[in-house]
Amino acid sequence: MNEDQFPKAYDPKSSESGVYSFWERSGMFIADANSKKPAYSIVMPPPNVTGILHMGHALVNTLQDMLIRYKRMKGFEVCWVPGTDHAGIATQTVVERHLRSSLGKRRTDFSREEFLKHVWEWKEKSQNVILSQLRQLGCSCDWSRQRFTMDPEANRAVKKAFKVLFDKGVIYRGYYLVNWDPILQTALADDEVEYEEREGWLYYIRYPVVNSEEFITVATTRPETLLGDTAIAVSPEDERYSHLIGAKVIVPFVDREIPIIGDFSVDASFGTGAVKITPAHDKDDYRTGMNHRLPMINILTPTGEINENGGIFTGLAKESARENIITSLEALGLFVRKEAYSSRVGVSYRSGAIIEPYLSKQWFVSVDSFRESLREFVNSKEINLFPPEFIRNYLTWVNNLKDWCISRQLWWGHRIPVWHNKHDEEYVICFDGDGVPEEVAQDPESWYQDPDVLDTWFSSGLWPLTCFGWPEESADLRKFYPTSVLVTGHDILFFWVTRMVLMCSAMVDTKPFADVFLHGLIFGKSYKQYDDNGEWTYVSGDQKREYDKGKALPKNVVAKWEKLSKSKGNVIDPIEMIDMYGADAVRFTLCSCANRGEQIDLDYRLFEEYKNFVNKLWNGARFIFGHISELTSRDLEEGVNKDLLGLEDFYILDRFNELLALIDSHYNCYSFDKIAALAYDFFKNDLCSTYLEIIKPTLFGKQGNDEQRATKRKLLATLLVNILGVLHPIVPYITETLFQKIKTTLGVVGDGLGDAVTGHAVSMLRSEACMIAGYPQPIELSFPQGLRESFAIAEKLVYTIRNIRGEMQLDPRDLLQAFIISSEKKELLDACIPIMCALGGIKTIEQLSEAPKDCIFSLGVVEGIQVGVILPAEHLAKEHARLEKEKIRLENSIESLSKLLASEDFRTRANPNLVQAKEDALRNSRQELQSILDKIASL
């Protein structure tokens, strides 16, 4: 075998693009909606067209590709639909930032159409990069079915869904308190708001009671909102204020008289027991305002400034207004004090702006009619959540679900398909066709389309349907919907997963998927480096990489696992990793740590480890090729002579069957990390470190005959083909490369079927490619009774021999002689001898009835079986001298420690921990000395 046929080192860059082109060119990714095979389908969680793939995308798409490749090889008609998401807020924000930096212009400097042209250009560039990166990763998507959440098909589906819900009265519009992002100037849904604990102040303010000398004092975290106060509330049971219920107070600066009301929701122990009610700017106050029919006065502009209702403070940013109001209250004698106070503050998940409860006219989806079906899908196990620990989270969220605000004040997105009459705001037309409604076409001057767009999650909620052509009754929809599984991160269980269940079931009255696998979120190691002043910066780049790989940390550097963040320097670029280590190493790394919903700790060390495994796979296959290159496919078609199979052969075949059973069970419950661990362990330990080492003497002609050697070679070829099939879903590139080399080496497969051992390998080799070959099947063979127990004894005997060699410090390169003594199990021990010789470094092993008298040996016992290693004569004196030297060292140590511990002065003055440590050292030295004396006696 020369270097051209099989290079010594695997080079991912030289093979990956060619392998992928071969798959795609051959049409192997394309699904057939008319196939009679059982369907297996996945719709890709569409990456946002905001930029490029990150490590989370690499993880989720690796896991999906594993499932798709596994099921394809299992005989399913698989359909994996790729796509991208328009990501309304995120993409518009990125493009606005790009236009400011490149052209020096803001969105409002363009017309809506002009701005959207720039967004579409951005989308095309970003999408092309993303799809190229998915190909690099090895994703076997059906690119002929590629989708975008704002393509014409998606737009038709969105308009249809809106019309269906609108006609049912589920979609409604009205003035409600929404989560307002003053930076992006749009409403957000409740689950788009993140909450942070922040330090602030509690301000105490006095309100003068009308026609009275009294004042009522309230405590508030937001004094600027007093401009919109419409009541003061107290508990009806609070005797301090019961006489004031029904009275009125004057709101400073705006001179508005507002009532003091009694409301049982007031916590009398908070602050002063009296609270200001601002229904237009606080959710709790909004409910109180609705219950008491209070006016709702909005005091803010969409940008977060005080509007015309703010009197002398009009035009000020709310932070400036707060300072000015406090100063003015002090001047009026109405400010009492402030005290430190921490509270949970809502923050926009996109812009980071503090969310402002804001009274605004928005479109909503009423969720009450969906709540029961959302619960039932999961409770009845029609939809299975993995891991099941998330079921409780899901049900809690559904039980507390509030109406969904679906309108966004953006330009990029699906325009709300509603037209308003300019003369009568309540007169609207919802239209899901192309163009405009007929009534609008006849009198366009009297109508305008709603300027808002739909929440991104509205269109994403229809994704499983739109990917297969809904609302058309397509062949794809009939074959591949509902989908088999959704793979995504647990962080969007509520953002997206539940909305898909809601939207899809509302449209077609069935679930969108059978299973949902929620993977954990990726964390990276961040390193804080402190200077002499205690200031710190994050370490990044090559320095971080070295620390990840195990370089010792200096005393001024502290490591911590944290969510991936550019600012923390712990982001790992998946494409950079592919360039450095190859796609297979990246995929194996991600698969190996893809636990069920827990934190995923990822660092460069793991990529190094699995790059080494990929190299091990290449080197192991190269070794096997060196011994099967003379075989032909006809040799495998003939099968193997089962009478020539040894204990080690039955064992490796049995282990392979066990591997298949375990891997199948783990695929069924999405335990990707366990699949990776099993495949890794079988190839590295069972096949290479154990089986190959056992049969090397036979392969190299040092034992056995030609027929036995031929049997081993057939087994090696069979095992290699099968393990490539098992590994293919995880590491598709190298397995395909090796599979093609085997096909080339063995030649065209004929009509022979092989036998129980080689049959499936022969069948696989008839396939054009590994990715469309049948998945390996259990080898139906009559295995010897007690096989596993027998091999376990062989392993224990090998372990004992290795222990003896280690204790006697025998050169591992020296082939020694050994013997075994047992009154029974002779046949078993005969079968164990080749294994013991190969793995224990033994030249010959004899079965004896008693220990030999004419040699020196070291003895061990395993389950009543004595195993002795005969020691070389020249080793005896050397080992005896070494043991005597060690004996003297230990005796001196014992004498020294004994004297120290006998000293009363030491025992009374020394730290008790030190005394205990010395006592432990004395005890250990005595035990070591006894062991040395025993060894000397045995010599």
Swiss-Prot record:
CDD domains from the UniProt entry: Anticodon_Ia_Val (cd07962), ValRS_core (cd00817)
Chief localization: cytoplasm
A GO CC term attached to the entry: cytosol
Coiled coil: 873-939
EC annotation from Swiss-Prot or TrEMBL: 6.1.1.9
Family as reported in the entry's similarity comment: Belongs to the class-I aminoacyl-tRNA synthetase family. ValS type 1 subfamily.
Entry domain remark: ValRS has two distinct active sites: one for aminoacylation and one for editing. The misactivated threonine is translocated from the active site to the editing site.
Name of protein: Valine--tRNA ligase
Gene giving rise to this polypeptide: valS
